[in-house]
Amino acid sequence: MTMIIRKYFSGIPTIGVLALTTEEITLLPIFLDKDDVNEVSEVLETKCLQTNIGGSSLVGSLSVANKYGLLLPKIVEDEELDRIKNFLKENNLDLNVEIIKSKNTALGNLILTNDKGALISPELKDFKKDIEDSLNVEVEIGTIAELPTVGSNAVVTNKGCLTHPLVEDDELEFLKSLFKVEYIGKGTANKGTTSVGACIIANSKGAVVGGDTTGPELLIIEDALGLI
């Protein structure tokens, strides 16, 4: 049974900048209390790790992952890297952990991926091969609604994709084909925020959306991600 819940992370509705999830794992900020961690784990049916990245709680903005790989920025600290690798090993997950040496460290804002494809910002074009090798999927370079922050302006799972509301229909078709998803749609979260990737973490089993998200927005999110 799929689940979707509204949630604040310590009062913050932009939970997508603070966390990332795949089908198997969820990375969450250290400041989150255990009850919230357990609730997220239950909704997404994932193993959760609380960590900083580069000393920052902006885990979702700074990293990106799918079932094959985890991409981290060059500012990741050794202790954090060891913590993440140990967590993966303890859970018998053999992911390609790759540090992307770009000066653009907000990888989660600049990469959109599921287990079937990835869209990366033109700002990361020099790292396309590294990203492709780690995530083990077809990688395309592009924008969403003409914005280079593709990870901030959409959210994708193995079932569906929700994009910035100004995406054109032909762009929707391109994204649907790239990510090989059954469902796709345009919408907002957190009372009209167009950067939906900053407001939502989701996989094929469930979604956690920012606490300011309205009922009508929630219906569109559920539909686009195939969670109904």
Swiss-Prot record:
Any one GO biological process: cytosolic ribosome assembly
Family: Belongs to the eIF-6 family.
Signal peptide boundaries: none
GO molecular function, one term: translation initiation factor activity
Statement: the UniProt record of this protein carries the keyword Protein biosynthesis: yes
Organism listed in the record: Methanocaldococcus jannaschii (strain ATCC 43067 / DSM 2661 / JAL-1 / JCM 10045 / NBRC 100440)
Official protein name in the record: Translation initiation factor 6
SMART domains tied to this protein: eIF6 (SM00654)
GO cellular component: cytosol
